[in-house]
Regions:
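Intrinsically disordered, low-complexity linker/loop segments enriched in Gly/Pro
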Residues: 1-30, 36
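Phosphate/adenylate-binding glycine loop and adjacent helical scaffold
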Residues: 5, 41, 49-68, 75-113, ...
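Short, glycine/acidic-rich beta->alpha junctions
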Residues: 16-21, 55-56, 137, 152, ...
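Long, compositionally biased low-complexity segments
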Residues: 20, 27, 31-39, 69-71, ...
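Solvent-exposed alpha-helices and their adjacent loops that cap or buttress functional pockets
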Residues: 27-30, 65-67, 137, 170-172
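Generic beta-strand/beta-sheet core signal
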Residues: 38-40, 76-78, 159, 181-183
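Short, charged beta-turn/beta-strand-edge "cap" motif at the junction between a beta-strand
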Residues: 40-45, 166
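C-terminal alpha-helical interaction appendages
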Residues: 112-192
Length: 192
């Protein structure tokens, strides 16, 4: 779990992930990976925990091979004013970049703290849906391809149909997750 503080609440349940990151439970977040998060509060308030020695997609039974964590993390703050024209300019969700892929994280509710109202932190456990998470991952990947690769909506959807893999990230953390993966090599040699 790596995330930042959301702006909607002073105290937040650490189990459901959201636009701020948190308990995303994507095993690809590890050595050599880069995570990008939108900063919602002054100071960002980064937190990390719940490391796994191994985990498959879905974390189906609610746990992975839990372990302690000792690591070196590099935190880089990208000021919003410097992001114009980059893939991070309109980022409002956790984005994972590996050496070979970009991954968008979709959730049942992109911002459950806002969307589900006053009781959101308990309601999220009753309202999660893989269908909703898939729709969110689809929307995020479509926007990513249009905004960062200059594709039309039709081009983005066509490319997603042949080159984007969707997987269930987790179905145990309240705000269920689906990730959309596209290989960077698809764009090798592309002229913008």
């Amino acid at each position: 779990m790596i995330g930042l503080a959301p702006k909607e609440a002073d105290v937040v349940d650490s189990i459901p992930p959201g636009y701020f990151g948190g308990n995303i439970d994507n095993w690809r977040i590890g050595k050599g990976a880069t995570m990008y998060y939108p900063v919602a509060v002054p100071g960002a308030l980064l937190s990390a925990g719940d490391p796994h020695a191994s985990q498959g997609d879905s974390e189906l039974c609610g746990t992975a091979i839990e372990c302690s964590l000792t690591g070196t993390f590099q935190v880089i703050l990208h000021k919003k004013a410097t992001l114009a024209g980059t893939s991070l300019a309109s980022l409002d969700y956790p984005l994972l970049e590996t050496q070979d892929e970009w991954l968008m994280h979709g959730f049942s509710y992109a911002n459950y703290l806002q969307e589900l109202g006053e009781q959101a932190q308990s309601t999220i456990y009753e309202k999660s849906s893989v269908d909703l998470a898939l729709k969110d991952a689809f929307r995020k990947m479509r926007a990513f391809l249009m905004n960062t690769k200059g594709l039309t909506e039709d081009e983005a959807i066509s490319l997603m149909s042949i080159a984007v893999d969707f997987g269930i990230t987790q179905v145990v953390d309240g705000n269920w997750g689906v990730h959309a993966v596209i290989k960077k090599s698809i764009f090798a040699g592309a002229v913008a």
